[in-house]
Amino acid sequence: MRRTTALMAVVCLCLLSLNAYAQKKKPTPTPTPSPVEQDDVVRISTELVQTDVMVFDKDGKFVSGLKPEEFELLVDNKPQPINFFESVVTGGKAEERMLRAAGGKKSSQPVEGESTSEVGRTVLFFVNDLHLEPGSIARTNKTISNFIDNMLGPNDQAAITSASGQIGFLQQLTNNPAVLKAALERIKIVPGATPDSQRPYISPYAAYLIVERHDRDLFNAFVDQTLKANSMRDPDDRPIASSMVEQRTRTMLVLSDAAVKNALSSLVNLMRSTSKLPGRKLVFFISDGFMPNLTGSDFTTMMDRATGIANRSSVVIYSIDARGLSTDSMFDASSNGGFDPSGIMQSRLSGERTFMQEPLHALAADTGGRALLNSNDLAGGIARALDETSRYYLLGWRPENDAQRASNFSKIKVTIAGRPDLKVQLRRGYLGAPPEKSKATAQPTSVETTDVLGVTESSSEELRAAVALGYKRTSGANMQLTSTAQVSAQSPGDNGGAIVVNVLGAVYDSNGKAVGSFRQRVEVTRTRANEPPVYTNVNHQVDLPPGLYQVRVIAAERGTNHLTGVMDWIEIPKVKEGAFSISSLFVGEITQAGGAAQIGVNASRRFARSSRLRFTTNIYNAATPVQLGLQIKILRGKQVVLTPPEITVGPDKISNPANSPYTLEFPLSALSPGNYILELTVTDRTKKVSASQQLSLTVY
């Protein structure tokens, strides 16, 4: 699993244990800042602010190879020198360092083998299920499912979130397709999301025109349709119908405003959570559109808050109208009182779609994205957005006054000199907010948790954790989940020695219910920056039924506020008793240290090219006499780069056909540095059935 500085918080038992541990610590006294320290704090006011820019030609293709002197930056309509310039690949190995450099910040310590790391993209789907019709939900599910199957890269991190929160515990970043599909299955019609089920149907836009724009002609048209729909033929019934329409329209606006507030509040929380994630993030905001500003509503404030936090968090929003080219239900006679011979309803409501799409335009434009509207090719829109945002130019410039330092400052214009044919796409604002002038000393780092994505930041760059998950059969169809938490520590200087670390872990099912936990205090050897890490392992096993599970681990250095964490998912399949199958791959590394082979579990899945990969799987219910074929494949992305000859395994190698471990070794010297997928397929030639397992690994 990819390790980033953005980590999943350990909750429930883990956080309770950690809080108890923290309460035992004595508070650290705040030292009096020296003049040098005070100068350092004040000096950060001269840091650069960052503007990310995408440049496209007339065909919508990204224009690469531009030089800094070709960019013209205007701030407050005044030319501004560009102090930092870089062409960036989204999710590339250097993106986070470039973002820090553009802000004038010191680069964090590079992790071991970082030069070969392929980080991948961060993609989030915000499904505004409070404003989705049933047909739109079906299209949304199909579109996101296509992304999972065909567009999710091996190094990407993705999450599916919703305005209603109905996804629950599965609303988390992951690279596991099973988790994403399970989250997608939870997107259903939200009860009460369609505020009007009576006839004739009155949309929020129609209610807006009647109540706030005082459109009497439209009001009377709905009164006429109400009379028809309810077979009210007596002239004395008209006041009753008028009262019904008036009450329905006012109720409609109240409910619509509440739904909009809830949706934007969920979006704000998501944007806050993404601030803990490194690099630039792409968010797809999927909705049928919704009502913009109403009288007395704080719509504008909430929109500004959402886009402001998005800009500070390096988020680009691409909004998608899930309706595609479908016909509005307002013009469906089956959902109304009947045909409107006056034509008033069709005339007045013809601008509804455009009006409801205004927030989609605003969210995208303010964050440097685009609104993908009026198209049935939703999957194609997502593919184009992924391509458009895959590269960008990062400009750093120095603000001249406090107004320009404000994160919501938007008087920024970028053009390409002498190239009016090129389109420059940028956000209204900039990436992040420069630190404010302050003479206060830095306080010890604390850990903050959020409800969205479960993201928190590590408080230590020296302390690192990894976790490897697997499953195997215990007896019959029963399964055991195995966890190996691996902790290492790096000295910020030349000091070695050892530290004491509390390792806490918890196992959760797909509903967030704790089904297992572990805690252990270990001693971790601290290595110098130029030395390979020394790992300390903590193992845990728990018997569980088939299902989707998450293991979260947090490691806290005793006596300090250094803390780090990691999480991963695993799906334990449901296998019939007696069926041919294999367990997970349990992987280790063989290195040459001190002239002797050293073998150990490698939870980080990072391997030196000079080492050999050793992995074990358990083979279950092979036919007798045993005739198995074992095929290894090495993939980079979705492309096979290496296929060693198939290995034949006979009865002499399998002592127990019902349950027998089998170990293989594979030299890594033939692989160039990078990220790979190891795939093992075991074929029972007698039964003519196969079983496969995969694991990701990084070679450096």
Describe the residue ranges of each PLM region:
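Scaffold/interface architecture of coatomer-like assemblies
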Residues: 21-700
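Bacterial N-terminal signal peptides
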Residues: 8-17
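Bacterial N-terminal signal peptides that target proteins for export
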Residues: 1-8
